[in-house]
């Protein structure tokens, strides 16, 4: 069973020479915009091996010379593949007996013995699985008294110096360009110190904690100057959620608002990333500016859209001069003229727009994104949480229902962890009041549960896991909201399916691994309905990873059906939606469904049915907008982009990309 098929989704096939240049001359050409040595790999494991190779070589060189190898290590998620590779090498015989490790940062203040310390996590991930001596492990002490912090940081700095400085330091990067926990505003000369973490950093750290326990407000961190004294620096990042900050770090100016840019001043710093994290580097996203290109349809569309945005012109007004002045003369040679390129791309984009997301019956579908037949279609919309369906494609769902298709909504997880305690209190007050008013307070189960839950919530401390009963009630609240939204959109309640995939039910932010039980639940639904059209979440960068695991479960089930040569699958198309956390890039859009002002208002109303996910929802991310506002803004932006390119002007649009099993 293939459990990570989402990682194989490649929207744009990047030519190998863009990330693995054949010669030094080629590398010099394609990296001309990059100010730090950057190594890009198609797979995370390959990048981890590069770092592990360097560390292994340094360890062995130190062993030969009879000295210690001094490492600085962070504990971000991006370092986990590196630790796994080093552990594998240890199991094959690599000794870490001569290795000294300095932890890059620690939370402050901490209680003695806290299992949420950065050092505890480093032990779990790496130190306890290799033969590093306990006396060779150093870390800032998060339990130290506040009056002694400055002296402690100076001592930590001196310990690094006494060991001869760091031979290699391996760090991740925060969304704001943090290295270790040096926040925006950190100076080039800063040394080990206490620092107040901002809200975005604390949110990232909360995910590492694996619970809702508040992250301590401060950290004790190596300073920028401390890091830059290392002989060799590795900065790692994986996944498209890091693409923007990597582009600013590697290609942008040095600025204290992005501390990672200080690495540009080091003579042996290397950024190690995968293709997803490299997605916004010039050589990947705008290769025509640095080298010759093989002009695929998608790359041509991307270049023309970029040219329109740069010149402020719609597609059909671009001239030969525009192409020549902006490094796109190759397209003129390929197509004969700018006019020919313009017509092709305009038509390509025009053909993505459809008011018939399920296909228009009895119509020529040659240039339509979805086929006309069969009609009506059996449709399943898979929604990771009980509101992702309406947030991401609420307008399309209403259109499918209104046009007569047999629409089913499958809510993959309970979403219970995203319900606030006050919602439970409100519903328990209602149930208790109902018991008193209508059944003479005679239901002893209700009375006991009301008392137990009231007592538990009153005594609940940050980080305490909800009881099974409370999680069930929170799940019921979300089920009720989902049913209300489905009814509003015209979907019969017997077409609403709550899958409650087991991987989600950890009771914590950190979920269980997606497994065979999850896949079988999805597969059973597919075999029951045998859909001719499927919609799945392509919004794989959600903060807690639920979307990716849910989509992986669907793709794994489809893959099993494909292996079994299921007849129904031959007549089925799979579409990926986004909207809750991101939107599709226009070069990848294959179907775009427009909405009128009235339809957009109906979509908003369907999102608002999920009342527990409004202002009081625990996990709104670092975006201050509510989900309906984010959704509308993205839909407005997509419509505006189409209009700016010279296509029809709509109020809003929802975009989709096809997945081929």
Model-identified regions with their sequence ranges:
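Short, surface-exposed, charged loop/turn segments at secondary-structure junctions
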Residues: 175-197, 250-253, 548-557, 590-595
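Ligand-binding beta-strand-loop-alpha-helix segment within the catalytic cores
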Residues: 22-35, 94-168
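Metal-dependent de-N-acetylase/amidase catalytic core
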Residues: 202-210, 214-219, 311-380, 399-403, ...
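ATP/nucleoside-binding phosphotransfer catalytic cores, i.e., glycine-rich phosphate-binding loops
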Residues: 2-12, 25, 30, 225, ...
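Class I SAM-dependent methyltransferase SAM-binding "motif I" and its flanking Rossmann-like core
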Residues: 180-224
């Amino acid at each position: 069973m293939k459990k990570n098929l989402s990682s194989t989704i490649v929207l744009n096939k990047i030519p190998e020479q863009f990330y693995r240049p054949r010669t030094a001359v080629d590398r010099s050409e394609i990296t001309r915009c990059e100010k730090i040595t950057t190594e890009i790999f198609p797979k995370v494991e390959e990048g981890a091996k590069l770092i592990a190779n360097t560390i292994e070589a340094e360890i062995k060189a130190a062993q030969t010379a009879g000295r210690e190898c001094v490492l600085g290590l962070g504990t971000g998620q991006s370092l986990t593949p590196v630790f796994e590779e080093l552990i594998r090498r240890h199991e094959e015989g690599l000794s870490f007996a001569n290795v000294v490790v300095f932890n890059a940062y620690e939370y402050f203040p901490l209680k003695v013995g806290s299992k949420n310390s950065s050092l505890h996590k480093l032990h779990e991930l790496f130190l306890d699985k290799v033969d590093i001596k306990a006396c060779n492990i150093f870390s800032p002490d998060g339990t130290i008294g506040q009056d002694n912090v400055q002296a402690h940081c100076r001592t930590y700095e001196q310990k690094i110096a006494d060991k001869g400085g760091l031979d290699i330091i391996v760090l991740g990067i925060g969304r704001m360009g943090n290295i270790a926990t040096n926040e925006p505003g950190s100076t080039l000369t800063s040394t080990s110190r206490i620092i107040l973490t901002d809200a975005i950093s604390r949110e990232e750290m909360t995910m590492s904690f694996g619970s809702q326990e508040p992250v301590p407000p401060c950290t004790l961190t190596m300073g920028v100057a401390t890091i830059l004294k290392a002989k060799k620096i590795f900065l790692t990042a994986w996944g498209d959620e890091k693409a923007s900050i990597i582009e600013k770090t590697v290609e942008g100016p040095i600025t204290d608002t992005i501390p990672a840019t200080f690495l540009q001043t080091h003579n042996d710093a290397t950024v190690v990333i995968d293709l997803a994290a490299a997605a916004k580097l010039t050589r990947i996203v705008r290769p025509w500016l640095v080298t010759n290109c093989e002009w695929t349809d998608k790359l041509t569309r991307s270049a023309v859209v970029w040219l329109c945005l740069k010149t402020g012109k719609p597609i059909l007004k671009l001239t030969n001069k525009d192409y020549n002045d902006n490094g796109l003369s190759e397209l003129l040679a390929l197509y004969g003229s700018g006019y020919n390129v313009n017509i092709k791309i305009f038509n390509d984009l025009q053909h993505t727009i459809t008011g018939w997301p399920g296909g228009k019956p009895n119509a020529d579908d040659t240039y339509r994104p979805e086929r006309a037949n069969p009609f009506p279609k059996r449709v399943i919309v898979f929604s990771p949480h009980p509101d992702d369906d309406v947030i991401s494609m609420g307008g399309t769902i209403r259109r499918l229902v209104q046009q007569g298709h047999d629409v089913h909504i499958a809510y993959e997880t309970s979403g219970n962890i995203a319900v606030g305690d006050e919602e439970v209190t409100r519903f328990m007050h209602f149930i208790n009041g109902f018991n008193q008013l209508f059944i003479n307070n005679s239901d002893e189960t209700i009375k006991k549960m009301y008392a137990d839950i009231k007592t538990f919530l009153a005594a609940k401390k940050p980080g305490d896991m909800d009881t099974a009963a409370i999680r069930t009630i929170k799940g019921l609240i979300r089920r009720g909201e989902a049913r209300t939204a489905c009814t509003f959109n015209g979907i019969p309640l017997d077409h609403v399916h709550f899958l409650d995939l087991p991987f989600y039910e950890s009771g914590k932010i950190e979920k269980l691994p997606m497994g065979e039980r999850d896949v079988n639940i999805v597969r059973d639904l597919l075999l029951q309905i045998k859909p001719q059209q499927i919609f799945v979440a392509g919004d794989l960068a959600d903060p807690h990873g639920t979307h990716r695991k849910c989509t992986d479960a669907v793709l794994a089930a489809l893959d099993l059906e494909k292996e079994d040569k299921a007849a129904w699958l031959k007549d089925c198309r799979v579409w990926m939606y986004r909207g809750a956390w991101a939107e599709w890039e226009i070069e990848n859009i294959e179907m775009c469904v427009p909405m009128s002002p009235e339809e957009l208002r109906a979509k908003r109303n369907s999102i608002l049915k999920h009342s527990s996910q409004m202002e009081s929802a625990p996990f709104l991310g670092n975006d201050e907008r509510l989900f309906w506002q984010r959704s509308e803004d993205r839909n407005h932006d997509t419509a505006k982009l189409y209009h700016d390119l010279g296509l029809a002007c709509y109020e809003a649009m929802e975009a989709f990309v096809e997945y081929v099993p």
